[in-house]
Amino acid sequence: MEDDFRVDHLPFPMPNRRHTLDQDWRFLTFMHWRVDIEKLRPHVPEGLEIDTFEGNAYIGLVPFMMKHVRPSWFVSTPGVSNFPEFNIRTYVKKDGIAGVFFLTLEAKSLVTCNFAPRTYGLPYRYASGYVKKIGEQWNWKSSRNKGQFRLAGTTEVIGQEVQAESGSLEEFLFERYSLYTSHKGSLRRGYTHHNKWKFQHAKVELTENSLTENFNLGIDEILTPELVHYSNGVRVRTYSIELAERIGSDINRDFLLLDGDCGLCHRLATFLDKRMKPSANLGYRPNSSKDAQMLIQAMPKKYSESDTVYLIRDGQVYMRSSAAIRCLLYMKWYYRMWYPICWLVPLPIRDIAYRIVAKYRHKVFKKPKVCTFRVD
């Protein structure tokens, strides 16, 4: 595996914030079947388009080893950072960004299976199993729910190591650098940065596959995948899960959304603009605008029910005083120094101050006949 992370092959830029996790994906067997798109659709959240190659939808079954999984600021931990994983995935896209959607992620890791579903909405489930090499073959096996969902087989690697050719089916299946999930009532996207896949052709002997059969995708030959590949793996950086709905094509652009029905909005945007640091990448929208409404409707319900100040920063949603305080991060250094101090004010006091401003803003700032809050 290569240690450096290249960017020249990426179909879109990675977020300009620090990645959250480092990990290695090792000893992967990729098995693929074509599936009936209508039988696949109920398993894919609304808002995602099932991606196809020459009119065909695919699912992939991938047993492999997760190695050295750790926060980007920490070291690999024995007994926690290495474990076998077995996932079933399909291929989707949203707003032109192709990615992967997981139907299930089976892993022999209590930490991952408890943390990932709650934090990211990823469908991790604890399963016993292994991925190990015996002689010249890779052996893999998983079992969940007292053997109700099982997978077992072997992989024999054949051929030379290659990379996917442009426009090929292998490029469609392998070269994806984002994942999608549905979490807390909203569609989320996560970015994954790794070098281009190197793989070999392979053949497998599947002896059990009730894991895939459970999804009732209409696969006739459940023990005979149509395509089989093997890869020694890649080193991976993953980024925090963010709101999948975006305004515009710049994934690194943040947005401040305000109600737009009083002069306060325009004054606030003007105040920020005059004091913005050169590297700030912040746009503005009134809440009533079409693209702002699109974002608000995509937010978790606890956010979308409130007409308030929203800040979409690094794909995360903040509102009311939490949004206002974070606006300091876009400003010059002598304003940013107030950022940690503002958090010392207790939340109840901040909420009272926010409600007072919201209640009397029309008396202090006369409501204009036409919204002057600029769109940028």
Kindly label every feature range from the protein language model:
Residues 1-72, 202, 211-249:
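Hydrophobic, proline/glycine-rich low-complexity stretches
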Residues 66-81, 103-127, 274, 328-368:
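Alpha-helical membrane-targeting segments
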Residues 290-376:
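Thiol/selenol-based redox catalytic cores and closely related redox-interacting motifs
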Residues 281-289:
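A short beta-strand-loop structural module common to alpha/beta enzyme folds
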Residues 256, 266, 280, 364-365, ...:
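Flexible coil/turn and secondary-structure edge motifs
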Residues 250-278:
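Local sequence-structure signature of Cys/Sec-based thiol-disulfide redox active-site neighborhoods
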Residues 56-57, 62-95:
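Long, hydrophobic/aromatic-enriched structural stretches that serve as scaffold segments
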Residues 87-249:
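Internal, well-folded beta-alpha domain core
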